[in-house]
Amino acid sequence: ERRCRFIAEKQQSCRPSSGLDGAFLIYDNEEECQFYDPRYDYNAGRERVGMGLALAAYLQKWPDSTLEKALHRYADFVRRELVNPDTGEVYNDYHRDNSYKRLYNAPWYARLYIEFFNLWQKKEYLETACKILRFYYAEGGSRFYPIQMPVAELIPLLRSNGLTIQADALMAEFLCHADYLAANGTDYPALEVNYEQSIVAPAADILLQAYKLTGVQSYLVSARKQLDVLELFNGIQPSYHLREVAIRHWDGYWFGKRKLYGDTFPHYWSALTGLALRDWGRMTGDVASQQRGEDSLRAVLSLLDADGRAHCAYVYPITVNGASARGADPYANDQDWGLYFALKTL
């Protein structure tokens, strides 16, 4: 609750004359102010959607008129500045700026519209979510490794709300995507970085979703091969920084204020491994994997403070290039994905 209130009170832009009105922005915990920069990892779109997701998930459990008002204002911002509900195109920043086209963005905003539907029960949100994913596939998304693709959640909702034609079309595209990832195996492409945990995790996730939707055993077998690789990024040291936390590098540099290189333990995307382990455990009855998944999901919550503040990453090395490093970065940026995962699963 404290984190959600902090987002609504401190991180929402409330400037009716600005295109940023309603946006959830970075918060500088040192300067006590919001921060916006058009540089990709500091802008008003992209991963910052995690704040909206966290509020939407929270409100489904604990209704609150003040927080819901903030979320409505954010929904207006998203529709006006970041998503075209007619075509499904998702923009990289406000002003519908798509000068940099990024496939990662689409599944996240489709997920946001699914959560809008779960909260407000308007079928138009499902239609928008479906359009976003259909647009994603039209742009070549079946050859990509997207983070947090929400198809296994969306397909049943489409069918139960009379959108069977849309569900069938999306299902066909999704299974082609899963087949491609299965055939690709461990021959991973270089994406925004050459190789990382969040390239392997989406492959495992999509194959597990395909198995959940179809019951076809070969998808489960292919997912296991991905999990065997994914587990290699994790350790089980007796520290909440290092127990079932996937090693990640430079996230403090890309998303933080300090701009420090170095391993981050944790960064919220570490929890992607936890989600995959949890799903595998639930589908196969593997209790140990379920517990490992829960440990991973809980570890990223250490990026949230008791007073509602938050930190985009924890840089673990004591020094980096001669500079003092170990500690939580001052920027509250996009770490609320971790809170969203917890609200949905723990």
Provide a role label for each language-model segment.
Residues 84-163, 169-177, 189-192:
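Long alpha-helical, hydrophobic tracts
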Residues 19, 62-91, 124, 141-152, ...:
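Active-site acid/base region of carbohydrate-active enzymes
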Residues 20-41, 87-107, 149-164, 187-209, ...:
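Carbohydrate-binding/catalytic loop surfaces
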Residues 176, 180, 206-346:
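Terminal, non-catalytic domain-edge segments
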Residues 1-79:
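An acidic-aromatic substrate-binding cleft motif
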Residues 2-10, 63-81, 120-139, 162-184, ...:
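Extended, well-ordered alpha-helical scaffold segments
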Residues 48-65, 108-122, 138, 149-167, ...:
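Well-ordered alpha-helical scaffold segments within catalytic/enzyme domains
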Residues 93-96, 115, 126, 130, ...:
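Flexible, surface-exposed loop/gating regions in the mature catalytic domains
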